[in-house]
Amino acid sequence: MNFGEAITAIKNGKKAYRQGWNGKNQYVELATRISYVNSSGIIINVKHDASGNNALAFVGTSGVQLGWLASQADMLAEDWDVRED
């Protein structure tokens, strides 16, 4: 599948990955209802649905990278697939 199809699958709650990625169990999914801890240690829940409260999350061997940005190679690749879990 191509990147556009992978993004559609991710927006529909699926986990997508590239067959060409080196690491096993790496995938991208949609993170919603994002919150963070500010410098004072207070948890801030971002509640702005109108402007968006979603981000792509890359889950890999080193943890989660929130706000993942696809490379040009990722965007042009035709080896995207969807995990069934």
Where are these regions (language model features)?
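Extracellular/periplasmic catalytic domains that process cell-envelope and extracellular macromolecules
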Residues: 49-50
